[in-house]
Regions:
Chain A
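Conserved ABC ATPase signature
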Residues: 134-138, 142
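Catalytic Walker B motif of ABC-type/P-loop ATPase nucleotide-binding domains
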Residues: 159-162
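A short, proline-enriched helix->beta-strand linker immediately N-terminal to the Walker B motif
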Residues: 153-157
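Helix N-cap at the start of a conserved alpha-helix in ABC-type nucleotide-binding domains
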Residues: 170-172
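Conserved ABC transporter NBD signature motif
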Residues: 56-65
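Helix-to-loop junction immediately C-terminal to a conserved catalytic motif
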Residues: 48
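Conserved ABC ATPase "signature" region
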Residues: 111-129
Length: 251, 242
């Protein structure tokens, strides 16, 4: 479980996050949603420690990550897997080396065990016979899968995904979403996904946190998304025609 | 001054939260091949022609019959070892290796590869930059030695083939009044230049923000700043050590 307490972050005079609190539950896909520029990615970066919040704390299973010393931060980070927007695969390494990288750095596993683990993770994300390919030789969707394989290779307790569907076709997006949800349930991980894709929200949104202009305006699940009673939230959700049709049918 | 302070802090961050020695050993070897071995042919070619041109021009300007011909190779020796090999090759090194370092790190920054390392709990400056600086400091003096040898060979071949100087005169000139301290000075300079080029280029690349355009700007800034730093340090080292 991850808990965020009163997180605020500004860049110069511009307030990006304003007093945001919330909880991300274990074994569920927790979504941070909102329009572009509302601070979703900044919040994610504050949670994983890529940015230091101006105020507030982040707790990973009751461990205060924000105020932790370097050793504890390092310990928590070893339990984190992250899928970046563009995959963030290392250009100079092939697929196998990319997935193996966290094991090389963070463990003392023998090579054959590492290879077994890498092959298991690649198979788990539906990739076979791509071990020796370079990132430039595979498609965007495959890069995302390799990114997921790398994120889960070290058995993380926490999985973070920054806009996992960006740049993907709708069909591949659904495959990636399903994969994230399956992995979350299968390995009982606390997963946090940043997205503004309503298909993802309706597909895998087990716990949803809605940001609007740097503030948390709404929290709920995909089941009570239709009756939030909040104009800003409805404006975001029902911009999509399919969502409007869905609401009309529900009414 | 703010930029300089940031640079000093960047250098300080290279030595905290380091990985295992084996990790650095492997990365440094890879960088040595990338930086040193792959630059050797260019350095050899450039220095060969620098030596050749220096010989031709020195011979052209020595018109007095009172000056012995072996002075040509003496001048070539001093120019090559003192300035051409360490300093001019440093400018070429900044253009080839420095821009490549800045471009590589800049691309890693904008594609979130550096963030990926940080999320894994790896000190990205130490992991990515320290091997580059160590490899540079190890390999650049070797490149300078190669440049010195190739420069003198170029001078010898062109000088003797054009008849500007006989082989015996050229070798005599090379050995005449030779001061071994010149080599110490050239190698000291090369270590300082290697450190400056690799650290400044890495610094510029590491802090790239934006997109592909900014990566190009970082690469250009890396080369220009490195070359200015090299030339300034060249002057101060000459004042200090000669």
């Amino acid at each position: 479980m991850i808990k965020i307490n009163h997180i605020s972050k500004s860049f110069g005079d511009k307030v990006i996050l304003n007093n945001i609190s919330g909880e991300f539950e274990k074994g569920k896909t927790n979504l941070i949603i909102g329009s572009s520029g509302t601070g979703k990615s900044v919040l994610l970066k504050c949670i994983v420690g890529l940015l230091q919040p101006d105020e507030g704390n982040v707790f990973f299973d009751f461990r205060n990550f924000t105020e932790a010393d370097k050793e504890m931060k390092s310990e928590v980070r070893r339990e984190i897997g992250m899928l970046f927007q563009g995959g963030a695969l290392f250009d100079s390494k092939n697929v196998e080396q990319n997935v193996m990288f966290p094991l090389d750095i963070l463990t003392k596993m023998p090579l054959n065990e590492k290879l077994d683990r890498v092959n298991f993770c690649l198979q788990r994300v539906g990739l076979e016979n791509v071990n020796k390919k370079m990132p430039s030789e595979i498609s965007g969707g495959m890069k995302k899968r390799v990114g997921i394989a790398r994120a889960i290779v070290n058995n993380p307790n926490y999985l973070f995904c920054d806009e996992p569907n960006s740049g993907l076709d709708p069909q591949t997006s659904i495959v990636i979403d399903d994969l994230i949800q399956e992995i979350t349930h299968e390995f009982n991980i606390t997963t946090v996904v940043v997205t503004h894709d309503m298909n993802s929200v309706m597909g895998i949104g087990e716990n949803i946190l809605f940001l609007y202009k740097g503030k948390k305006l709404w929290e709920g699940t995909k089941d009570n998304i239709m009756n939030s009673g909040m104009k800003e939230f409805d404006d975001f959700v029902f911009t999509n025609k399919a969502m409007r049709n869905l609401r009309e049918r529900a009414v | 001054m703010k930029e300089f302070g940031k640079y000093v802090m960047f250098l300080g961050s290279l030595f905290v939260r380091r990985e295992t020695f084996a990790t650095y050993y492997k990365l440094t070897l890879e960088e040595c091949i990338q930086i040193g071995v792959k630059s050797a042919s260019l350095v050899a070619l450039v220095s060969f022609f620098m030596g050749a041109v220096t010989t031709v021009q020195t011979a052209y300007n020595m018109v007095s019959p009172l000056i012995p011909r072996f002075v040509i190779s003496q001048v070539v020796r001093e120019m090559t070892l003192l300035e051409l090999a360490p300093t001019i090759i440093a400018v070429i090194y900044a253009g080839k290796v420095g821009s490549s370092m800045a471009g590589g790190l800049g691309t890693m920054r904008i594609t979130e590869q550096i963030d990926a390392l940080e999320v894994m709990g790896i000190n990205s400056t130490s992991y990515l930059v320290l091997p580059k600086i160590v490899a540079s400091v190890l390999m650049y003096p070797l490149l300078v030695i190669l440049a010195g040898v190739c420069g003198l060979v170029g001078g010898y071949l062109v000088g003797t083939l054009t008849g500007a100087v006989t082989p015996t005169e050229f070798v005599y000139g090379l050995r005449y009044n030779y001061n071994p301290y010149v080599i110490t000075f050239a190698l000291t300079k090369s270590i300082v230049f290697a450190f400056l080029i690799s650290s400044i280029s890495s610094f510029k690349g590491y802090y790239t923000q934006g997109g592909a355009l900014e990566v190009g700007i970082s690469s250009t800034a890396a080369v220009t700043t490195s070359v200015i730093a090299v030339l300034l340090s060249d002057y101060f080292l000459a004042q200090l050590l000669l």
